[in-house]
């Protein structure tokens, strides 16, 4: 029942309660994870199947969420595309040299997941065996605008001025890079589903840095390009889209073709539902900082979101990843509260 719960909600089918999982549910707030972090580098944790499976399963064993997401990073496919990068603890990704010239864009290779990402297949196949029918196994990828933001900036950024400069001065160059990324990521999503992922989340985290017109020019077409290619091979697999600070883009995201819009906490759930309409499921959208507060407040906020989301087409989650300073007991309370909700018919 638990496995189908998340998939049914993603397809807006009736469910007894909202399924629940948590972005970054395998992470630094867990003592078990910190023990492995102290022994192994981040990239090794992502690419060593034994480590990635163990880390993915830590929150599953502790909290029994309805979704188990593969431990990985959105930049993982970069190596296979000829884009060297490092994942530096507490600093994030570093791409050196960053991609800023036509020659560099032309040098980006097509992605062959079978050749460069075989470890991802092993991770997902193992997770499916370990989880069985108890939860849905999720894969995830970065969407083209967000991947390009890292590739052009060379690291995380506060204002994304360099990629926006490219967008506004050399748009053809940026479109060429985005097209390469979209086709690569479409292949990667298909590969993840072939390997056992039952749903896949697209992280276009930094598309929220764009105004609606620029989102429609530089992000939305490439999200849609991925979805269309995946649908040709796996038409039934739910696809989820996450954009941080997406409130100003909600009137447009439906054109991406995804099944579920994952909302950050800055938009009211009822307002988001009204804008998105009845045909798109939603995910979210508790402020991660609420989990730093007392449990009465956590419960109150959960109930408010669930009520506003309505009885179908809602996956409970945070509005962004769980914070490293979150008490494990509060994470446990979050899961237990959602899982203990009365059936929809009894509310």
Swiss-Prot record:
Any coiled-coil regions, as ranges: none
Gene Ontology annotations of biological process type: protoporphyrinogen IX biosynthetic process
EC number: 4.1.1.37
Chain segments annotated as transmembrane: none
Cited Pfam families: URO-D (PF01208)
Keywords: Cytoplasm, Decarboxylase, Lyase, Porphyrin biosynthesis
Keyword Acyltransferase: no
Residues of the site described as Transition state stabilizer: 73
Listed InterPro entries: UROD/MetE-like_sf (IPR038071), Uroporphyrinogen_deCO2ase_HemE (IPR006361), Uroporphyrinogen_deCOase (IPR000257)
Binding site for substrate: 24-28, 42, 73, 150, 205, 320
Keyword Mitochondrion: no
NCBIfam families to which the protein is assigned, alphabetical: hemE
Function description: Catalyzes the decarboxylation of four acetate groups of uroporphyrinogen-III to yield coproporphyrinogen-III.
Quaternary structure (record): Homodimer.
Name this polypeptide is given: Uroporphyrinogen decarboxylase
The species this protein was found in: Gloeobacter violaceus (strain ATCC 29082 / PCC 7421)
Classification lineage: Bacteria, Bacillati, Cyanobacteriota, Cyanophyceae, Gloeobacterales
């Amino acid at each position: 029942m638990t496995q189908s719960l998340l998939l049914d909600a993603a397809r807006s089918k009736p469910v007894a309660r909202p399924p629940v999982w948590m972005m970054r549910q395998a992470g630094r707030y867990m003592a078990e994870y910190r023990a492995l972090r102290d022994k192994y580098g981040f990239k090794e944790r992502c690419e060593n199947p034994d480590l990635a499976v163990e880390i993915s399963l830590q929150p599953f064993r502790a909290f029994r969420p309805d979704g188990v997401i593969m431990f990985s990073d959105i930049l993982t496919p970069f190596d296979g595309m000829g884009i060297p990068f490092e994942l530096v603890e507490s600093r994030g990704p570093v791409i050196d040299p960053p991609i800023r010239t036509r020659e560099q864009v032309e040098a980006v290779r097509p992605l062959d997941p079978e050749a460069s990402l075989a470890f991802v297949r092993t991770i997902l196949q193992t997770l499916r065996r370990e989880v069985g029918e108890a939860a849905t196994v999720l894969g995830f990828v970065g969407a083209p605008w967000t991947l390009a933001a890292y590739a052009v900036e060379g690291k995380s950024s506060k204002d994304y001025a360099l990629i926006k400069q490219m967008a506004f001065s050399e748009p053809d160059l940026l479109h060429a890079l985005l097209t390469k990324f979209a086709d690569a990521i479409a292949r990667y999503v298909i590969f993840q589903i072939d390997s056992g992922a039952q749903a896949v989340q697209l992280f276009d985290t930094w598309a929220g840095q764009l105004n609606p017109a620029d989102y429609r020019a530089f992000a939305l077409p490439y999200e849609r390009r991925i979805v269309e290619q995946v649908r040709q091979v796996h038409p039934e697999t739910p696809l989820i889209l996450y954009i941080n600070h997406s409130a100003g883009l909600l009137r447009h995201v439906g054109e991406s073709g995804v099944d579920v819009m994952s909302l950050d906490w800055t938009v009211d759930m009822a307002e988001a539902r009204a804008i998105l309409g009845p045909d798109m499921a939603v995910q979210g959208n508790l402020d991660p900082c609420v989990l730093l507060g007392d449990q009465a407040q956590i419960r109150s906020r959960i109930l408010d979101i669930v009520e506003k989301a309505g009885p179908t087409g809602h996956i409970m989650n945070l509005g962004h990843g769980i914070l490293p300073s979150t008490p494990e007991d509060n994470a446990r309370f979050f899961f237990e509260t959602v899982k203990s909700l009365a059936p929809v018919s009894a509310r």
